Amino acid sequence: MGTIRSSALILACLALASAASEGAFKVSDQREMKPEHLFQHLHEVGYAAPPSPPQTRRLQVHHSETSPHDPPLFEEQKEVQPPSSPEDIPVYEEEWLTFLNPNVGKVDPALPQEAIPLQKEQPPPRIPIEQKEIDPPVQHQEEIVQSRQKEEKPPTLTGQHPPEPRTWNPARHCQQGRRGIWGHRLDGFPPGRPSPDNLKQICLPERQHVVYGPWNLPQTGYSHLSRQGEALNLLETGYSRCCRCRSDTNRLDCVKLVWEDAMTQFCEAEFSVKTRPHLCCKQRGEERFSCFQKEAPRPDYLLRPCPIHQTGISSGTQLPFPPGLPTPDNVKNICLLRRFRSVPRNLPATDAIQRQLQALTRLETEFQRCCRQGHNHTCTWKAWEDTLDGYCDRELAIKTHPHSCCHYPPSPARDECFAHLAPYPNYDRDLLTVDLSRVTPNLMDHLCGNGRVLSKHKQIPGLIQNMTVRCCELPYPEQACCGEEEKLAFIEDLCGPRRNSWKDPALCCTLSPGDKQANCFNTNYLRNVALVAGDTGNATGLGQQGPTGGTNVGPAPGSKEE
């Protein structure tokens, strides 16, 4: 019996060992074959799992411009869609789900658990072989991106709408100094070469241009834009002088010389720095001018100017009611321009308007008291609130329709209502900022009106007096030419006999007389000049009264004080 039992035990052990060895061979076969089998199926279907989210989303977003810091583009990269019918590849989809989540769709419960971690340890498939990394120039990258968008039109991201077709928008095509994305050239550079075809447009009085300087150009890393802006400023100054010629032949000859001189000086400035010059500057003579002519983006000068957002001088019988809420930002205008604020005449004799006029008159009296305390903002705000509360008391005492804001009780809600309806919240109703760098008929129309000049430069009121006294009596078409001549004569006088009577912080008088000197004055002294409308002949106490009737608020930095 003992021998039989021992024999049975030996046979049982041999059977178990044989069964274990067969199971091990199956497991090893699965371990070796399954990752390769899975990758083969995935490669055939077209999955690139798991994809790289940052690069994929970046390439799907519609960008019109590429950045040199973006990741390199890939050639022939496109999203491969899986077959729409699940019957085509049932085995592949099942194995793909098993690869992503081992707990889903377990086919063989007897499969050893150690096989699953080995599947997770397999590295993900890399970028398909068709994707070749390229590094083209920036311009070529833009062409690749644009052509790829046109051909494939990848699906947009969630919540992102496809780009709308581009339509003409003056705000997009106007000439302006922008801060943000800067390129290799300014809008309108190089300028078109003057010819009989564009001469009329060049000398059109309504044609506006941008005066370039530190206020609208970057000051670091873009010195080439400053040189382009200086060339455009010099060119426009010369154009203004040439367009005063009565003969078209003389005008054309003049603007041609101005254009050639501006381009020549631009190239001299380009070669004066250790950077790569403009491509046209590498040529000489007529070849250089022909190059600039071909490179001009707008040779016809047909440019839609940017809308000028400025406060126009008001006219008519409109009453500036309700008055704006006094704030620390507008209290200076409240006090300095108080004597310039005028009440419209010939107002309708209605009770409602008379009550508004009475409130404004009372408020101006209170403002005068507050301004004597050193531009006291708290005082002006309290006077504004008390005046409007009294106005509402009179409105509600009459059995008519009161002002809409008076329906609120005395509270911040009432104050907010009045402040929201104020037509001139900054108290600049009669203030207009003009640009004397280019004298136009519209500018002369403002200057010939009854106004006063507010400028930090002492000589500006004298210039405007010369322009108005000698030019406003001429016919309307001749006023602008006369004003430009008076401006140039005044500049010549300031840099000549009167050179020692004023300070020249911009050193304009050290430049050679002519276009360079006039351009310096246009850029530094004549760009922004404030005009005040109304009869201000009796205004005193707001500053220094000049011999021309102009007023200078505070000492002028460009004047020599005795």
UniProtKB/Swiss-Prot annotation:
Record region (2 X approximate repeats): 172-427
Segments of skewed composition (Basic and acidic residues): 129-154
Role played: Involved in endochondral bone formation as negative regulator of bone mineralization. Stimulates the proliferation of endothelial cells and promotes angiogenesis. Inhibits MMP9 proteolytic activity.
Keyword Kinase: no
InterPro entries from the UniProt entry: ECM1 (IPR008605), Serum_albumin-like (IPR020858)
Compositional bias ranges of the Gly residues kind: 543-552
N-terminal signal peptide: 1-19
GO molecular function, one term: interleukin-2 receptor binding
Disulphide-bonded residues: none
Primary location: secreted
Organism: Rattus norvegicus
Localisation: Secreted, Extracellular space, Extracellular matrix
Self-association state and partner proteins as the record states: Interacts (via C-terminus) with HSPG2 (via C-terminus). Interacts with EFEMP1/FBLN3 and LAMB3. Interacts with MMP9.
Sequence ranges of the Sequence repeats: 172-301, 305-427
Protein name: Extracellular matrix protein 1
